[in-house]
Amino acid sequence: MKFGIEFVPSDPALKIAYYAKLSEQQGFDHVWITDHYNNRDVYSTLTVLALNTNSIKIGPGVTNSYTRNPAITASSIASIAEISGGRAVLGLGPGDKATFDAMGIAWKKPLATTKEAIQAIRDFISGKKVSMDGEMIKFAGAKLAFKAGNIPIYMGAQGPKMLELAGEIADGVLINASHPKDFEVAVEQIKKGAEKAGRDPSEVDVTAYACFSIDKDPVKAVNAAKVVVAFIVAGSPDLVLERHGIPVEAKSQIGAAIAKGDFGALMGGLVTPQMIEAFSICGTPDDCMKRIKDLEAIGVTQIVAGSPIGPAKEKAIKLIGKEIIAKM
C-alpha cells in the first residue's frame, strides 16, 4: 500500500512545503496539491515543494483541461519534473461544473476532453510535435522546446465511463471515495477498461482520495470530518447515497444548510454517523487502519489522506506515519 496526502493551497506555499517535508519524513509516497482558481497557483506551490523536499512524489490532484490548455499543463508539469529531479506526477480529471459556471467556462464532453488531453500531454512531454484534430482538443504542430521523459498520469474519475477510461489509458486513478462499497463498483469498471485495452489491471494504481480524519480521540476526529463529509453528501448522486442507505432528501437538507452558512446545523446532527462511515476514513489509528485494510483487500493500492487529515494537521500527519504507515 502506498500513501499520499492532499494539501489545499489556501495556505502560503512555504507552510504547505513544511507539511510536505513532514509528510516525506513520515513515509508518505505522494503529495497531491489541489488546483482551484481561488487558491494559490498549483504549479507555483509545487515548485516550492520541489525545492524543499527530496524524495516524495509531487503533483496536482487534480487539474483539468478546461481552465488549462493541455500544452500549458504539459509545460508546467514537465518543469516540475525537471526541478524536482523526476518526482512529478500529474493528476488530471474532468473538473466540476459549478467551478466552470462561476468562471464562465462551458463544460462540454468531459470524457472526450479528458481522453484527448491525456494523449496530447503524453506526446508533449515525450518531445513529440503534436498535431491533433480531436473532437475537443486540437493542435497544429505544437511542440515543447524540452523533453521531460515519463511522467505518470493519474485520472480523477467518479462515474462508470470515466473509471473505465482510466482503466484503459491512465497510470493511476484518483477516486473521491472512502468506503469498500464504492470501490467494489469502481474496481470492476477499472478492470473492464484495462481488459478492453489489453492491459493488466494491476498496472493501474487504484487510489482512494479520501476524506481522512485521525486522532486518538475519536470524537475529535469525527467532528473535524463533519463539514467535509457534508459537502460530499451534498454533491453525491442519489445512487451513491442509496448504496449507503442514506435518505436522498438529506442531500437537499445539507445543501440548504451549506448555502446558508449554517455550520452549526451540520455539526449538530445533520451530518450523521452513517454519513461519516460512508464518506470518510475517520477515527482512532485503529479505526483508520481497519478501513485501510478493508480497502486494500478490494484492490485499492494507494490511500490519500485528504481534508481535513485530522483536527490538528501536524499531529495527524505524525500519527499516520507512526501508527499506520510504519505498521503497514
UniProtKB/Swiss-Prot annotation:
Main localization, broad class: cytoplasm
GO biological process: methanogenesis, from carbon dioxide; one-carbon metabolic process
Subcellular location: Cytoplasm
Keywords: Cytoplasm, Methanogenesis, One-carbon metabolism, Oxidoreductase
Record pathway: One-carbon metabolism; methanogenesis from CO(2); methyl-coenzyme M from 5,10-methylene-5,6,7,8-tetrahydromethanopterin: step 1/2
Tagged with keyword Translocase: no
Disulfide bonds: none
EC number in record: 1.5.98.2
CDD domains: Tetrahydromethanopterin_reductase
PANTHER family membership: 5,10-METHYLENETETRAHYDROMETHANOPTERIN REDUCTASE, PTHR43244
Family: Belongs to the mer family.
Alphabetical list of NCBIfam families matching this protein: F420_mer, PRK02271.1
Name used for this protein in its record: 5,10-methylenetetrahydromethanopterin reductase
